[in-house]
Amino acid sequence: MKRSAINDILGHTRQFFSQHDVHLPPFASFSPAQWQQLDTAAWEEVFDLKLGWDVTAFGRNNFAAHGLTLFTLRNGSAKGMPYVKCYAEKIMHVRDAQVTPMHFHWRKREDIINRGGGNLIVELWNADSNEQTADSDITVVIDGCRQKHTAGSQLRLSPGESICLPPGLYHSFWAEAGFGDVLVGEVSSVNDDDHDNHFLQPLDRYNLIDEDEPAQLVLCNEYRQFR
């Protein structure tokens, strides 16, 4: 991805969040120069847990079709130490018709919440013993209501609705085409993007970046430059 595209994406997402009255912590606005001036030891939790901005096209070259913009607000250590929080929270911007590819988590249990905008479509499959999609019915809980659906069902979440996804359940999601972008919340157990994501089709979690212009903000996988 080009840095200029990432700058534009983040600018658009910040506007979208503002339209939905979403307020982020101050470090969401820190430029690279501001990060350079900080006492990095005081910010180790942000660095270690990859709090902050994340822009990905999942290693592909078409962000509009396959991509996601998110901000991790809080998280804990995967093994419980040194950061003892047992929960995580993200806020996400899913653009109209933009797909997050099919994947599951080995350990993370998460609630995906449509906080506003258009409709969110979630496609669900059980994983078989070979980590492929299974033909068995899936069972999920939507806003406290336990439901059974056929394999590969695509469930529509309108604003205000949420779904609980257990570990090992394949899921892909996108904003329903023609209904606009979606503000998505995620509340979960500890998030570990380095070790707890399994994609049905192997892909890269982060994109290589072509530095065609200066970065306006810092992504969560770029903090190493400040340590």
Swiss-Prot record:
Pfam families in alphabetical order: Lyx_isomer
A molecular function GO annotation: metal ion binding
Keyword Transcription regulation: no
UniProt xrefs under InterPro entries: D-lyxose_isomer, EcSI_cupin, RmlC-like_jellyroll, RmlC_Cupin_sf
pH effects: Optimum pH is 7.5.
Positions of Mn(2+) binding: 103, 105, 110, 171
Thermal dependence of catalysis: Optimum temperature is 50 degrees Celsius.
Catalytic function, reaction form: D-lyxose = D-xylulose; D-mannose = D-fructose
CDD domains noted in UniProt: cupin_EcSI
Effect of substituting residue 205 to A: Retains 9% of wild-type activity
The enzyme's E.C. designation: 5.3.1.15, 5.3.1.7
Binding locations of D-fructose: 90, 103-110, 171, 186, 193
Assembly behavior: Homodimer; disulfide-linked. Dimerization is facilitated through a disulfide bond between the two monomers of the dimeric enzyme.
Functional summary from the UniProt entry: Sugar isomerase that catalyzes the reversible isomerization of D-lyxose to D-xylulose, and D-mannose to D-fructose. Shows similar activity toward D-lyxose and D-mannose with a turnover and catalytic efficiency for D-lyxose as a substrate only 1.1- and 1.3-fold higher than those for D-mannose, respectively. Shows weaker activity with L-gulose, D-talose, L-ribose and L-allose. Overexpression enables cell growth on the rare pentose D-lyxose as the sole carbon source.
Family label: Belongs to the D-lyxose ketol-isomerase family.
Protein name as annotated: D-lyxose/D-mannose isomerase
Natural source organism: Escherichia coli O157:H7
